[in-house]
Swiss-Prot record:
Protein name: D-aminoacyl-tRNA deacylase
Single annotated GO MF: Ser(Gly)-tRNA(Ala) hydrolase activity
Taxonomic classification: Bacteria, Bacillati, Bacillota, Bacilli, Lactobacillales
SUPFAM superfamilies, per database record: DTD-like
Organism: Enterococcus faecalis (strain ATCC 700802 / V583)
Subunit and partners: Homodimer.
Record field: catalytic activity: glycyl-tRNA(Ala) + H2O = tRNA(Ala) + glycine + H(+); a D-aminoacyl-tRNA + H2O = a tRNA + a D-alpha-amino acid + H(+)
Length: 148
């Protein structure tokens, strides 16, 4: 599982020009599911995201988690995180999980974040989405369970 986490002051996702998810302060998370991912990978990433201390405390240091600031997450499925570009110019997505594997794990990911007390907004799995956000920092962090 690979996620790209961006600290944002706001973010939203639209499908066919209709806003389907939006948040204020928190994270916009791009979520890629690998063909070999398991619920254990989901739990690992959720644990990292929920405790990641990248929000400023009273002294201006990155020392607070999304839970501590009562922030939200905009979760966007993103199979292209598993693009391979070694050969040729057209990316291969062979390592990305097929929808029958990816959808349940993506839903589990969002459910586990909510179980941690974090409000989660989402796009729609497999849809053509327009995502907009205001980076805060910017702070961008990548977590890949293949590298833990």
């Amino acid at each position: 599982m690979k996620v790209v986490i961006q600290r944002v002051s706001q973010a939203q996702v639209a499908i066919e020009e209709q806003i389907v998810g939006q948040i204020k302060q928190g994270f916009m998370v791009l979520v890629g599911i690998h063909q070999e991912d398991t619920p254990e990978d989901v739990a690992y990433v959720v644990g990292k995201i929920s405790k990641l201390r990248v929000f400023e405390d009273d002294e201006g240091k990155m020392n607070r988690s999304i839970q501590e600031i009562e922030g939200s997450i905009l979760s966007i499925s993103q199979f292209t995180l598993y693009a391979k570009t070694k050969k040729g110019n057209r990316p291969s997505f062979i390592e990305a999980a097929r929808p029958d594997v990816a959808i349940p794990l993506y839903e589990l990911f969002n459910q586990q974040l909510e179980a941690e007390g974090i409000a989660v907004a989402t796009g729609e799995f497999g849809a053509d989405m327009q995502v907009s956000l205001t980076n805060d920092g910017p702070v961008t962090i990548v977590i890949d369970t293949r590298e833990k």
